[in-house]
Amino acid sequence: MSINVFWFLPTHGDGHYLGSSEGARAVDYSYLQQIAQAADRLGFGGVLIPTGRSCEDSWLVAASLIPVTQRLKFLVALRPGIISPTLAARQAATLDRLSNGRALFNLVTGGDPEELAAEGLHLNHTERYEASAEFTHVWRKVLEGETVDFAGKHIQVKGAKLLFPPVQHPRPPLYFGGSSAAAQDLAAEQVELYLTWGEPPEQVKEKIEEVRAKAAAKGRTVRFGIRLHVIVRETTEEAWRAANRLIANLDDKTIADAQQAFAGFDSVGQQRMAALHGGKKDNLEISPNLWAGVGLVRGGAGTALVGDGPTVAQRIQEYADLGIDTFVFSGYPHLEEAYRVSELLFPHLDLATTELPTQRPATQPQGEVVANIYVPQKVSQS
């Protein structure tokens, strides 16, 4: 089975070491452009752009990189509760049209109550998933060309519709990750691809089986993806030295402070990541060639595949055998590691070819929209 491999744009910072300013690198537009263009040239199918208060805005970053890339797809965040589903649908359609079908969307409910409160969202975990399900329903239907009336517990819209359709039909794919039962229910019912963070294969297998069964009960099928860091070198010994170097400047206080902050999250996925290492720097190889060192101080994806090209490819195949067809990778620093992954890992993988959709013949009305709602009609010839 061919696999899709994405890279990552580090809009929240980059460098040679975790948790340290030593070896840090300024992340400005020029640098992000270098990474995006490298990923485009090297054969990555797309890039994940992170979201949150520690990041640059993912939509603006994606839009700014459209003109300087050719085939690269952009996986950007949808934030239920922070933006209306109708406005989000218009923005999604615009990004898809401007990029000629290179837009992908990642539903992010959020897992840090403190950050969400700062955004004006004061729902608990259960309520957030209720609101996310309502948001996603409206967003999907509007993008698919329907006129939507919806009265839910959290979202109410009347006459919501889209005048400018997306390039991808019926709409751009929706990605989503979450480890709670509520998250899996949402994935089974409404998304195209369920993402998991890089847990050991046995744990990932359990999650896939649960989501697959829930989707089947609703008459749906769902694709699967995984989010991992990668440390690949010419030899496995070199790769492990590189992994240890990455956390060489981490002290116990920095780790403890990070873990205390993560403990305030209500994200089940973040809790599962923290349990893999227990906040300690020893015994970080939690499964063959799967290293939990990144998660000592980084929220979200906290594990890395470590080894030479053939070894890492073997571990990737183990995940692929579970049904995963999309791998979202990253590595520090992200520019150099994009080249390393391409040169040392790609020759051992069966990579899917990136295909762009055919441009729709009429994505723009002929003439100006009348009264903000009516598309001008062609005058009949007598």
From Swiss-Prot:
EC number annotated for this UniProt entry: 1.14.14.5
Keywords: Flavoprotein, FMN, Monooxygenase, Oxidoreductase
Record carries keyword Oxidoreductase: yes
Keyword Oxidoreductase: yes
Catalytic activity: an alkanesulfonate + FMNH2 + O2 = an aldehyde + FMN + sulfite + H2O + 2 H(+)
Gene3D superfamilies the UniProt entry points to: Luciferase-like domain
One GO MF term attached to the UniProt entry: alkanesulfonate monooxygenase activity
Broadest EC class assigned to this enzyme: oxidoreductase
Protein role: Catalyzes the desulfonation of aliphatic sulfonates.
Alphabetized HAMAP family for the sequence: Alkanesulf_monooxygen (MF_01229)
Assembly and interaction partners: Homotetramer.
Note, other: FMNH(2) which is absolutely required for this enzymatic reaction, is provided by SsuE.
Protein name (database record): Alkanesulfonate monooxygenase
Organism listed in the record: Yersinia pestis
Gene: ssuD
